A protein has these predicted regions:
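N-terminal beta1-alpha1 cap of cysteine-dependent amidohydrolase-like domains
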Residues: 1-109, 119-127, 131-168
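Conserved G/P- and acidic residue-centered "switch" motifs that form tight phosphate/ATP-binding loops
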Residues: 112
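The feature captures the ABC ATPase H-loop/switch
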Residues: 115
Length: 170
């Protein structure tokens, strides 16, 4: 995730921050994997020549997790409302990250925004606001129950994901 410079923030107000949400890191660790932050190779402070392709060669896979909405321009649309502007800079970085891991033949797993971003990276589109564009859709942005929101997932047999999860079915 990115936090762009924000003068109202108490800590590192003038810095771009990248982070892994702790509960997401814990889920990855619970599966026996070691979470590693992959820093953006772009920006005013970029140094060195390590690329996203280098990370894709070095790591076993990547988990794309939640955060700000995907910028509508990433899938060829204009924002329907100004507050639905998403995060263009993060999108560009993460789309490049997805493409690097796919090019290296490594698995890419998306959770929430991450799944939406993978869809966009492969040319898909999104609803900008499910609550207004899909009446009756589930509300996913309730901070009180954030960690209790789950969806049942059916893992297709004989797929790369079923092999990685070794028999998981939901």
């Amino acid at each position: 995730c990115f936090m762009h410079p924000d003068q109202t923030r108490n800590t590192f107000a003038f810095k771009t921050l990248q982070y892994i949400e702790q509960s997401m890191a814990h889920w990855v660790m619970a599966a026996g994997a070691m979470p590693v932050l992959i820093p953006s190779p772009a920006g005013d402070t970029a140094r060195g020549d390590i690329t996203l392709a280098d990370y894709a060669d070095w790591l076993d896979g990547v988990v794309m997790h939640g955060g700000a909405d995907v910028w509508p321009g990433s899938y060829g649309e204009e924002p329907l409302r100004p507050e639905w502007s998403g995060d263009r800079i993060r999108d560009e970085y993460e789309i490049a990250l997805v493409k690097a891991f796919v090019a290296a033949g490594k698995p890419v797993l998306g959770i929430c925004r991450g799944l939406q971003l993978i869809n966009v990276a492969f040319g898909g589109t999104l609803y900008q606001d499910t609550s207004t564009q899909r009446p009756g859709a589930l509300v996913h942005r309730d901070g009180q129950v954030y960690d209790q929101q789950f969806h049942t997932v059916k893992i297709e047999e004989k797929t790369r994901l079923s092999a990685i999860l070794a028999g998981a079915s939901s």
